[in-house]
Amino acid sequence: VLDVGTGTAQIPVELCRQNKECRVIAIDMAAHMLDLARFNIEVDGFTQRIYLQQIDAKDMDFEQDMFDCVISNSIIHHIPAPRSVLQESIRVVRPGGLLFFRDLMRPESDEEVSRLVEMYAGAENPHQQQMFDDSLRAALSLEEIREMVTSLGFRDDMVQATSDRHWTWTDRMQDN
């Protein structure tokens, strides 16, 4: 499994907890996030199954068709040119392999942004509220991610709104 934008590596840790055979390469550009990830992996005892690398997701130094599965949670809205991350992920997943991307979904109005910030970050400090507001505004809309997925040769109906603030794209690479 390749985890793109692993952050603190909570998802790879959970994958390894649930599947004794799972091995994960977890990448992130932020050194401070990888430091937190390294700590979490050590605490949970998965240093032999989760491998961290500081890599730019837009230009991954992995062989084509290398991974059975590529996952990514909440990184797309942080990347100015997200299409390149999707292209690279498609390149490195093997035929028949799984693609799983989830991210924030940009609301259709300022009022909806405010409502979501209040609902999900209302108890947080103003800085955290602003970060969530900024993230929602930076996110792709459902229509934008569907258009992007279609332009990459995949079906747009494989991208779904999975909450009031998230979209999820799950698909399999076609066998050659």
Model regions and ranges:
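A short acidic, Gly/Pro-enriched loop at the edge of an enzyme's catalytic core
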Residues: 58-69
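A short glycine-rich, Lys/Arg-flanked "PGG" loop and its adjoining helix->strand segment in the class I
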Residues: 84-95
